[in-house]
């Protein structure tokens, strides 16, 4: 585990919640600038979702939803991760994703679900965000 003290180590990667509110693209840009190879976080199994949810509940200072690295680049419900990893696991909140008013193409962790479930949201909304890095 080479993660810095305030990062969560999991499956060879390190995760950190940032409370500063940013639009989705700005959040992804922030993660990338933090260190080469960093992105908004991607998830590949239920266990990861639970561990991240617990970590965010413990460390997130605020009520904001939290951006992750999933987005619908083509705007056709074909969700992709910014780290180009395989979209092999999805855990949507009830009745989501819905592309509400054809404007929601970025994905957030929903605070009311304890950050366990996902919602598609307007990419320009300001949220906290979760970066994932290799150190």
Swiss-Prot record:
Q: Give the molecular function GO annotations.
A: galactose binding; lactose binding; metal ion binding; rhamnose binding; toxin activity
Cite the binding residues for Ca(2+).
96, 98, 104, 119-120
Question: What stretch of residues is annotated with the motif Galactose-binding?
Answer: 96-98
Disulfide bonds, paired cysteine numbers: 3-14, 31-131, 38-133, 106-123
List the PROSITE patterns hit by this protein, alphabetically: C_TYPE_LECTIN_1, C_TYPE_LECTIN_2
Q: Which InterPro entries match?
A: C-type_lectin-like, C-type_lectin-like/link_sf, C-type_lectin/snaclec_domain, C-type_lectin_CS, CTDL_fold
The cellular location(s) given in this protein's UniProt record come to: Secreted
Q: Where would you say this protein principally sits, based on its record? A: secreted
Q: Gene3D superfamilies from the xrefs?
A: Mannose-Binding Protein A, subunit A (3.10.100.10)
Q: In which tissues is it expressed?
A: Expressed by the venom gland.
Please name the SUPFAM superfamilies in this protein's record: C-type lectin-like
**What start-end ranges are recorded for coiled-coil regions in this protein?**
none
Keyword tags: Calcium, Disulfide bond, Hemagglutinin, Lectin, Metal-binding, Secreted
Query: Subunit info?
Result: Homodimer; disulfide-linked.
Output this protein's name: C-type lectin PAL
Organism expressing this protein natively = Bitis arietans (African puff adder)
Classification lineage: Eukaryota, Metazoa, Chordata, Craniata, Vertebrata
